[in-house]
Amino acid sequence: MKRAFVTVGTTSFDELVARVVANDCVQILESLGYNHLVLQVGRGTVVPKPFRTESFTLDVYRYKDSLKEDLQQADLVISHAGAGSCLESLEKGKPLVVVVNEKLMNNHQFELAKQLHKEGHLFYCTCRVLSCPAPVSLLLVLLGSAKILQQLPSATLSCFGYLPTQAPVLVATAYSYLHSVFSSFPPLSTFLIIPCTMQKGWKKYCGQKSLNEASMDEYLGSLGLFRKVVAKDASCLFRAISEQLFHSQIHHLQIRRACVSYMKENQQAFESYVEGSFEKYLERLGDPKESAGQLELKALSLIYNRDFIIYRYPGKPPTQVTDNGFEDKIILCYSNNGHYDSVYSKEFQSTAGICQAILYELLYKDVFVVDEETLKTAVDLFRSGSRRNKHHALTASVEGSSDQKSSTEDRTEEAAACSSAASTPEGNKQGTERQKVPESPSKMLFPYKVLKALDPEIYRNVEFDAWLDSRKELQKSECVEYGGRYYFLGDKCQVCMESGGKYYNAHIQEIDNDKSSVVVFIEEFAERHSIPLAHVRPVNQVALLPSWNAIPIRNGRGYPTITGGYFPEIVMTDMNMKQRKKMFKKFRGKEIYMTMAYSRGDPLVPSRIQHSMHYGHDPLLYYSQTAGHILSSQHFYPQHSSQRQGRGYGMPRDSSHLISKQNLPNPKVGFCSGSGRKCCQSYDNVSYRSRSFRRSHRQMHCMNKGCQYGFAPENGVEETVTFYALEEGNETAYSTLPNNGGPTTMVPATSGYCVARQGYNSCKPPLNSGDSNDHCDNGGYHGDYLYSSEQGYETSSVYTTTVSTANLSLQDSGPSSVPQDTVTSYNYPQKVLENSAAIAVSWASHVPVPVIPNCAGDNEALRTSDISSQNAIQPGFVPPPAQGSPAYLEPSAAGAAGAAAAAAAAAAPVATPVAAPLPLPPPLPPPPPATLEAGDASGFPLPPPPPPPPPPPPPYSYDPSGSDLPQDTKVLQYYFNLGLQCYHHNYWHPMVYMPHVQQQLQPQPQPQPQPQPQPQPQPQPQPQQPQQQQPPPQQQQQQQEQVHGESYPDCTEQPLVDQSAPQVYSDVVREDGTQADVSTNDTFPIADAVPLPHGAVYYPVMTDPYGSPLLGFDSYVPVASDYSSIAMWHPVNAACGASAQIHGAMNPGPIGYMLLPNSPHYTPQN
């Protein structure tokens, strides 16, 4: 009775136990003569039930005090890879098969089993079924090997242990018995030729094939077939047919041409299977790079009188593609990727291996005149020294037998085999897998592939090897070197058609054989061209080019320094978003956008050409030199590139990588390439992550002159705006570009200015007397910024609105004054403010406002502190000089925002003059009343604008169906919410809602002198001349017709409210000075009628009484709107005046429509 003992020690190895007690395994044990099986299951959960039959007995237990008795009685030991079990079995001299538990990690079982196997003491494997060409369980391999070892002589078995000199004898003896033992098992015959390399040899082989291919090889091997791999290209079908017809694959092109010709001659039989043009299909089929399919198989079957049988799926019978009744068959294997391989029988493989060996022997003996003994010795050395590779080739896989190493590796391996034969005793040669490479390769005889072909037991796939070699050469040719640079297929590059010509973006598609030129696809032309390598250059991602005006940079704070910053337009245009993001560098904890100019001194662009350059998003930004020493020039380009206008690259479209104080993205400002676009972008509430950049910067938002929603083309010139971020101390070291003359005024900063100009000019006038070469394109506007500077213009009244975190400096020329901490100065000219509208003033708390001189000493500025964002905002009415109350601010001659305030009002700003005012200019004619809609309500004399023809009025919405409304829903949402917000502000003064009572029916009273001294940086008109500022009725009528396109009759309604006196929310002042109680129904009583001063009504946009939207919600409710004023339209016609009632108003009568004739165009945030 033969006994097999299976042990797992103290571990748990349920998979091994389950495999051993399986029915198929028990039957194999019985067929091999084993009739008693003992299982030691250890801690496992799988515990089979013992049973006893007449032919087989199964005993099961978990632990014993000692395994010596079972090991002594066992004829075969199957054990886990534990060191104790292996040593005990080897000490007993028992045949041992070790099964490695792959679920155990880092226990060195595999290394131990591999080393003992390498020394010839045991066999090892795993429980999983390998992807091998034979569908057998690994347990069959184990049991078969055990029977082989049982048949070995006892003297040989006694060699088990640690005798390395006798171990190879055991391996050789076991190998000699494998064929005889498994001759009755055809599926195992090829798989178990060399069981010692079962793990190591198959690992590489299995890694080269896909799961489908391995399963197909296993299935074909069970049928006595093998798959010969064909070159994996579009001609695989024709190669396989050529080989089966002519025993060679070199005729695949002739077979392809024959197929095309036959299908062309018999078009009626194949045309119905083709979609589209049949001629085009045949034309494509004639290309060797086009694959073939079932239609071509049908034609080839008729051409060569053979039917095709194709194996498609493992485990399923083949498919007979053609059934033409031919006796000869062509068997193919089809993969899911459309690849065809040849299928042969194993007998053909054996015969082909012998024929191949004879052919190569004749070749080397008769052609290369190699001694026969030399060939024989080389083959013997190959068989003994490269047994792993020999087994690799005998496993019926042509892929595995096709060596893919370079010739150097082949020669090295062959040299190792020769060295092994020369230095190793005869008894050790057969068990040596690989020896060290000798120092001298002079003993190398033949390449490894040649030795495989000389071995009659190996069938080498020569065709596949040749195709692989050609692919290697092709891969080597996919790279070309020129001028120290390497160019690969698919690389992007820039090429020029002729020497010194323009470079175009392209990518390499082919490399010529001579390696002197490449075939590229030029994107701009959408054409292929052969370009010499001398005209090819690589594409640089982002290049820092030297700036035009280098500024000395001193080291400080240890930050890195970049000494260049001008990025041409073509470089920025070609960069994608990912490359642009790379420009947003991080330096020691702060994020700096590379296109900003960080400098203490003058701009990088010379002042002599600054007026002739066309800027992008924002102007040059100058920060203190200690803020990182990053020197970079703003993107600029000439004015003639009108098609690129408005697409500057100073800042990205998405300013989300600028983090606000609330960690929210900065509001986006869209940009348009139209010639009428006016853009001005800075940074609103942006705090840089740096000690040097902890200042907040305000933003002057985008204004679109070409918008059709309440805008009119304007007249004037523009220049850049200079932003400053200041360090503490050193208040006079930072200066802007010098301008020419004019006073300097500082007003409280706003979150956005709505400054408009009237008139239209077909071409921009020169920016100054020295720059007269400016021109315009198509009569449009070139400047991208709202504010410009020019000598000889005065400021109008400018007031603050909403909230601010910085101060604004209205500078005309010369070096600017440098404010203190948390002050940001804005440099823009006064001409833009010509005919501009006064802006409503915030009624927040103010501190005394000093005036400090600038660096040059010839300008004066008015300093204000930050305006609190927590206080309520009241409407402000800006009349001409009239008798008023301290509750309102009176505009000064200089247009300062904190010009007048009551001494009793704690929130009123107080101005302290520091320098004497300039002399007053002579009186000038008043501006036309149409400027009221453009934003000018000051009434002070200003220089008359040139007399250009009035522009056509912007279109209004007249269609009741709303078809002429803007299509952008976000724009509609914004203005709807704006009107709704005004509706809910029912606690405002009724003058806000009734523009028709603003008509001046009586003379205006004189303004009261203010107790506080007023700064006088600008000329102030005489108080006794208020009537000169009002145009005659005929001129007013004409201006209304020009702006609105239609005239309205004068309003004869009596005024209802005293507009000259301030109205407090809680009180109503009558004409007699008494107060009227406020009604409890949320309305105000109507005051006595008094003469009304002439002027526009301006009110601030209040904060949303219903709360701000949630974070992340893209709402268009104008919460604390950045639009500084909303000019009122004065239609007095009954048909045009609205009859809507304002709930909660003092006099809910008819009101006029409101529109924004010159307010900034709302840009939706994407």
UniProtKB/Swiss-Prot annotation:
Stretch list, region Deubiquitinase activity: 126-394
GO molecular function annotation: cysteine-type deubiquitinase activity; N-acetylglucosaminyldiphosphodolichol N-acetylglucosaminyltransferase activity
Active site: 233 (for deubiquitinase activity), 236 (nucleophile), 339 (for deubiquitinase activity)
Main EC class the enzyme belongs to: transferase
SUPFAM superfamilies for the chain: Cysteine proteinases, Tudor/PWWP/MBT, UDP-Glycosyltransferase/glycogen phosphorylase
Any single GO BP term: dolichol-linked oligosaccharide biosynthetic process
Segments for region (Disordered): 393-438, 921-966, 998-1056
Pro residues composition bias: residue spans: 921-930, 941-957, 1004-1034
Keyword Translocase: no
EC number: 2.4.1.141
Keywords: Endoplasmic reticulum, Glycosyltransferase, Hydrolase, Membrane, Multifunctional enzyme, Protease, Thiol protease, Transferase, Ubl conjugation pathway
Residue span of region Glycosyltransferase activity: 1-125
Effect of a null allele: Knockout mice lacking Alg13 display occasional spontaneous seizures and hyperactivation of the TORC1 signaling pathway.
Keyword 4Fe-4S recorded: no
Every OTU domain range: 225-346
Residue ranges constituting the Tudor domain according to the UniProt record: 486-546
Pfam family for this entry, one: OTU
Family annotation (CDD domains): OTU_ALG13 (cd22795)
GO cellular component, one term: cytoplasmic side of endoplasmic reticulum membrane
Family per similarity comment: Belongs to the glycosyltransferase 28 family.
Listed PANTHER family: BIFUNCTIONAL UDP-N-ACETYLGLUCOSAMINE TRANSFERASE AND DEUBIQUITINASE ALG13-RELATED, GLYCOSYL TRANSFERASE-RELATED
Known role: Catalytic subunit of the UDP-N-acetylglucosamine transferase complex that operates in the biosynthetic pathway of dolichol-linked oligosaccharides, the glycan precursors employed in protein asparagine (N)-glycosylation. The assembly of dolichol-linked oligosaccharides begins on the cytosolic side of the endoplasmic reticulum membrane and finishes in its lumen. The sequential addition of sugars to dolichol pyrophosphate produces dolichol-linked oligosaccharides containing fourteen sugars, including two GlcNAcs, nine mannoses and three glucoses.
Protein name: UDP-N-acetylglucosamine transferase subunit ALG13
